Amino acid sequence: MENILDFTLEELKEWLISKEEKAFRAKQVFDWIYNKLIFDFNNMKNIPYKTKNLLSDNFYIGVPKVVKKLMSQDKNTYKFLFEYKDGNIIESVVMKYKHGNSICVSTQVGCRMGCKFCASTLDGVIRNLTSGEILSQIMAAQKEIGERISNVVLMGSGEPLDNFENVTKFLDLVTSDTTLNIGQRHITLSTCGIVPKIKELADKNYNITLAISLHSPEDLLRKEMMPIANKYSIKELMEACDYYINKTNRRITFEYALVKGKNDSIKEAKKLSTVLKGKLCHVNLIPVNEIKENSYEKSTLKNIESFGNILKENGIETTIRREMGADINAACGQLRRSYVSK
């Protein structure tokens, strides 16, 4: 059986026609799934009994089961553990802002990138998520909170560009007016920096925001923090970023997790200013998420502010990320790992 969420409207129309069914039934089914959030063919009232049986015999609606739901004390962050049909568990985070609800989705079960500050990668990657499985996190979360989600961040477990085909099909699906109709400018994709895939993504000319996990302006330190840096130098990464900017005319966000005594010095800030000078970019400074498997500690707020001021003095737009959901292990991979290891 196939997950119907992996299908575009046109693909489902073609399938129905091949079974001598009416093509317009596809739009009715999509309306039940995406607008009414009905995840059982038998509850689709305007679909004939024969068509329901045909769909039930060939498809399932692959929305995951909620195995854990946590809410932060301020009620602005929800953390979900979702379980798929095969028993694999992933996590998603919903953050409530004045401008709307945002969800951080996972693109893989686990991750193989090995970044030292990330809990998602500690047990490696188990498998890729399909386009429909990524999409289903938004639908399951919307049903749980009873509100529309209007912004998507691909920054949960997994490296999106390591699952390129499924992620790009997800982007096509989620932005379609036949499904969730989320605008491309409301989507951010975060990558550790797989250079050829950044260029491939640029060629698709999406209007999404690309976020690069940079974390150091120096190759030696970046290699220590992020194994991907052993494959692609900062020079190569910056060339790929320039290609992306020139191709899409979209500003890139550089994510920089500040680790006490590691990458938060004035010297590092000045070097980063040099690396990024003249680029259409924005820097997001992040207090590193502390995990027990390494000795990384958060920089002090004073250090983070001093670091940011140097970037601003050099004409680089900079913000400090607001921490949300710390009381519910909302950082990437932390909740899933604690649940799975029980």
From Swiss-Prot:
Stored Gene3D superfamilies: 1.10.150.530, Aldolase class I
Compartments reported by the entry: Cytoplasm
Active site: 91 (proton acceptor), 332 (s-methylcysteine intermediate)
Gene Ontology BP terms: rRNA base methylation; tRNA methylation
Superkingdom, natural source: Bacteria
Molecular function GO terms recorded: 4 iron, 4 sulfur cluster binding; metal ion binding; rRNA (adenine(2503)-C2-)-methyltransferase activity; rRNA binding; tRNA (adenine(37)-C2)-methyltransferase activity; tRNA binding
Disulfide linkage: 104-332
GO cellular component: cytoplasm
Coiled-coil region(s): none
InterPro entries for this protein: Aldolase_TIM (IPR013785), Methyltransferase_A (IPR040072), RlmN_N (IPR048641), RNA_MTrfase_RlmN (IPR027492), rRNA_lsu_MTrfase_RlmN/Cfr (IPR004383), rSAM (IPR007197)
Residues holding [4Fe-4S] cluster: 111, 115, 118
Xref: HAMAP family: RNA_methyltr_RlmN
Family: Belongs to the radical SAM superfamily. RlmN family.
Anything else known: Reaction proceeds by a ping-pong mechanism involving intermediate methylation of a conserved cysteine residue.
The protein's name in its UniProt record: Probable dual-specificity RNA methyltransferase RlmN
Organism of provenance: Clostridium botulinum (strain Okra / Type B1)
UniProt lineage: Bacteria, Bacillati, Bacillota, Clostridia, Eubacteriales
